[in-house]
């Protein structure tokens, strides 16, 4: 929000946060670390129930803390989804029967396994990004130079994936 509203010229955060913010920001460099995947998941013991609920209700109920990304993904697939915005422990949505599925990020899959959830769809991969305010990119050469230097540094680095991570 600081960068999008002009309080800062540039920043670093995950691709997921940039997309979900909906702000007009320029992603200049994929920093290549902090890898995770955006996934759709459901309880393993309720396999097929979401499709039956969709046929009966005409919509899929989905818990997420990323409503913009989830809505866009379902819309791109022609699926009507009722998005339930939750903050923290979204995996409980389908476990307690409040939703059919979840959309969330995962790096190792540990939380999914702990809650007996299985991946039913992969939405996108995310890594940390260097991003800038478009106005700052046009007006301040230091912002562009910083982006160029980061891009050059990333080319020479090699991040080893953490065991069990999304990479």
Label every model-predicted segment.
Residues 1-167:
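Domain-level signature for soluble enzymes in the chorismate/prephenate branch of the shikimate pathway
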């Amino acid at each position: 929000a600081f960068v999008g509203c002009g309080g800062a010229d540039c920043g670093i955060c995950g691709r997921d946060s940039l997309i979900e913010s909906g702000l007009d920001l320029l992603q200049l460099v994929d920093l290549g670390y902090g890898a995770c995947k955006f996934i759709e998941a459901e309880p393993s013991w309720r396999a097929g129930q979401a499709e039956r609920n969709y046929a009966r209700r005409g919509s899929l109920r989905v818990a997420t803390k990323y409503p913009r990304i989830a809505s866009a993904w379902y819309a791109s697939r022609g699926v009507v989804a009722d998005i339930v915005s939750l903050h923290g422990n979204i995996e409980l949505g389908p476990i307690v029967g409040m939703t059919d599925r979840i959309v969330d990020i995962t790096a190792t899959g540990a939380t999914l396994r702990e809650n007996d959830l299985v991946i039913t769809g992969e939405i996108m991969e995310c890594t940390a990004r260097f991003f800038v305010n478009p106005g700052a990119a046009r007006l301040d050469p230091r912002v562009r130079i910083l982006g160029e230097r980061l891009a050059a540094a990333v080319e020479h680095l090699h991040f080893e994936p953490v065991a069990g991570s999304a990479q």
